[in-house]
């Protein structure tokens, strides 16, 4: 059993590293590891942060593996092997990173073995990741990865399209939630569960903006 858990964690780490290698500027960044030094000059306003989990339950907010906000020519990361929100969520290998360059900001967050129950709705996934990027002068972009997502034991067909919504009692689950601001800042939430008046849970969130 220990070997199975170790292999699963290695697979998650490999998938995350492979995804980061597709980014022009963040190819050398590894979530939960040492980030490369950014260039020495950045112009404009920088927005960047990431978190593995941000859960607000009955007005109480918990953040797991959150980077906080980056500044110009900055790099932040956060990771833990296991984490959870009491009576709501458990997960493994929670990681987040954000980095700013002279003309680009990249951020990403991920976790594995997600199991959560929000207002009676059970949600599981083997792997969840969000990534966002913006190059100065161009609109930001991002994507999400969700592996073996199930809601109340029923497998969910993840389309890959932004803002795929699934109704649940009292609210909805939004998959690959994406917003692009007027300045091009990209915000990507891989999984967003909202139950009105009870809970607002975001799993794997990444923000990247430079203007």
What are these regions (language model features)?
Residues 27:
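Conserved binding-pocket/active-site segment within a compact domain
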Residues 3-14:
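Bacterial N-terminal signal peptides that target proteins for export
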Residues 30-211:
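Extended, solvent-exposed, non-transmembrane regions
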């Amino acid at each position: 059993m220990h070997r199975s858990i170790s292999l699963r964690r290695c697979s998650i780490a490999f998938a995350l590293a492979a995804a980061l290698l597709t980014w022009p500027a963040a190819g050398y960044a590894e979530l939960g590891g040492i980030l490369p030094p950014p260039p020495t000059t950045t112009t404009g306003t920088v927005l960047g942060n990431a978190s593995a989990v941000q859960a607000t339950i009955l007005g109480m907010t918990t953040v797991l593996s959150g980077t906080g906000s980056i500044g110009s020519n900055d790099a932040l990361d956060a990771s833990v092997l296991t984490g959870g929100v009491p009576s709501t969520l458990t997960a493994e290998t929670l990681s987040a990173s954000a980095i700013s360059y002279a003309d680009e900001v990249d951020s990403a967050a991920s976790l594995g073995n997600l199991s959560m129950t929000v207002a009676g709705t059970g949600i599981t996934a083997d792997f969840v990741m969000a990534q966002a990027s913006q190059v100065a002068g161009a609109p930001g972009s991002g994507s999400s990865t969700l592996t073996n997502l199930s809601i109340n034991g029923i497998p969910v067909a993840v389309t890959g399209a932004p803002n795929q919504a699934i109704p649940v009692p009292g609210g909805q689950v939004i998959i690959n939630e994406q917003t692009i601001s007027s300045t091009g800042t990209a915000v990507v939430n891989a999984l967003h569960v909202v139950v009105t008046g009870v809970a607002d849970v975001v799993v794997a969130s990444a923000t990247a903006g430079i203007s």
